[in-house]
Regions:
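Lipid deacylating catalytic domains
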Residues: 1-44, 81-153, 157-277
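N-terminal accessory alpha/beta regions
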Residues: 24-79
Length: 277
């Protein structure tokens, strides 16, 4: 995993004109996915849902409906809009309708789309509601941040883990880069963050000097494309640099994000920021 991801980061930097700035040993990976596996020694295991009807938690069901709504807004030509489902409590029937609609979205990765989405929903729910999982995932991130770390990159749920890690256990790194992030998703993610947002604003991560947020225009996971209004420090002292990309048909794909020139530019800017002191 390290080799492929390191190569993708370096590719993005080189596309942005940073040839020779990074080598594979400069890139480290924080992995916490084992905590979600059934039989994990870290926490009590949990079955992965095999079908949409296995989503038995209200948070999972509501996340699915919110993704459906976001997909209908982003791709009205492909995804039919919900007709009042969002105003009622989720049911197995509406969850199935949401899944059927989402499978038409560009955000879903081909033949494994349903399995991917079901697993993602369960992981998000478990992270947000299980304190042991939350603590383990954040420790997996903070223990990999060294004194010479200049940028932290978080993708999808990993962006939530990275953000919370840097807030709860501040580290002096140059920059945070979030990719395909659900951080701005109201109520279900944003309002459940730690530290808890207040007055519609969340805390700026301590020790971070710059923050770039990138997502594809069709990415339903990153349903809120602009994080600035939610995380900027009043007065312009710190602002999120929000950018919308076009990842082609791999809308939410980590590799496509990392190799994008815009991500490379954000990494280069972080390296320069740290070098300039």
């Amino acid at each position: 995993m390290h080799g492929a991801l390191a190569a993708a980061v370096i590719d993005g930097v080189e596309r942005a004109g940073g040839e020779g700035l990074l080598t594979p040993p400069d890139v480290d990976i924080a992995f916490y996915g084992d905590v979600f596996r059934k039989g994990s020694r870290r926490v009590r295991g949990d079955d992965e849902p095999g079908r949409v009807t296995d989503l038995d938690d209200e948070l999972e069901q509501q996340l699915l409906l919110d993704l459906w709504e976001a997909a209908a807004v982003a791709e009205p030509d492909r995804v039919a809009a919900p007709t009042g489902e969002g105003t009622r409590a989720p049911t197995p029937l509406t969850a199935q309708r949401a899944m059927n609609a989402l499978l038409r979205s560009r955000c879903m990765p081909g033949a494994v789309a349903e399995r991917f989405l079901l697993g993602t929903l369960r992981q998000v729910r478990r992270y947000l509601k299980d304190n042991d999982i939350r603590r383990y995932a954040r420790e997996a991130v903070t223990t990999r941040i060294a004194s010479d770390t200049t940028v932290v990159i978080g993708h999808s749920l990993g962006s939530v883990v990275a953000y919370e890690s840097l807030c709860v256990e501040p580290k002096s790194v140059g920059a945070l880069i979030t990719l395909g992030s659900p951080l701005g998703m109201p109520k279900l993610v944003f309002d459940r963050l730690d530290p808890t947002p207040s007055g519609g604003r969340a805390e700026w991560p301590k020790g971070i000097r710059s923050w770039s947020n990138l997502c594809d225009r069709h990415d339903v996971v990153a349903s809120v494309k602009r994080l600035g209004p939610l995380f900027d420090v009043p007065g312009g002292w710190r602002t999120v640099n929000d950018q919308v990309l076009d990842n082609g048909w791999k809308v939410h794909d980590l590799g496509r994000h990392l190799t994008d020139e815009a991500t490379g530019r954000a990494v280069i800017a972080a390296l320069r920021l740290t070098h300039e002191g």
